[in-house]
Regions:
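Extended recognition/assembly regions associated with phosphoester-bond processing machinery
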Residues: 1-174
Length: 174
């Protein structure tokens, strides 16, 4: 996965340059983390403990380094950068198969907290803003007059046979 993310950073960079060559004006960048950035080490399904490659510390380290690398690569190309995230179910702090603390006590979100602290230390990245929910499983952003909602798919448990039906059902109840 790390190799694919590193390739994605290069591909996005190339696409930005390509669009600008075509005359497309790009001044704002939005980077979203939609959860499950880490797999966790157990408590989600029976085989999880035996199917992961890295312990939780290493998973968080790899995810943080990839996120920071992406932002460091892209941020100098934009006037404004907004980085936002929502928690996923695999990032939950779990015990005996259940999330036992707050929604905000989530490894997916803590990776973004750590990245925010890293970028806050460097004046070169003052144009990078982070939006990190304190204890919500979702957030909304106004992007150039369009309200955009972010939520991880584990919110959509009921409301239809297909995932898009479940998402619409969940959204209508908000």
């Amino acid at each position: 996965i790390a190799d694919r993310v590193e390739q994605m950073v290069l591909d996005v960079t190339a696409r930005i340059k390509e669009l600008r060559k075509q005359g497309v004006s790009l001044s704002n960048l939005y980077v979203f983390g939609l959860g499950d950035i880490v797999e966790g080490c157990g408590e989600h399904y029976a085989m999880q403990t035996f199917s992961i490659e890295y312990d939780l510390r290493r998973q968080k380290m790899i995810a943080r380094r990839l996120l920071v690398k992406a932002i460091r690569t892209w941020a100098p190309m934009f006037n404004n950068v907004v980085v936002a995230c929502v928690p996923g179910n695999h990032g939950e702090n779990r015990k005996n198969g259940k999330s036992f603390t707050t929604f905000g006590d989530n490894f997916d979100v803590s990776i973004f907290d750590e990245a925010q602290e890293i970028f806050a230390e460097n004046n070169k990245f003052k144009h990078v803003k982070f939006i990190i929910p304190e204890n919500d499983l979702w957030l909304t952003l106004d992007i150039s007059g369009t309200i955009v909602g972010l939520a991880h798919g584990h919110q959509f448990r009921t409301g239809g046979r297909y995932s898009h039906q479940k998402a619409v059902s969940w959204l209508s109840g908000q």
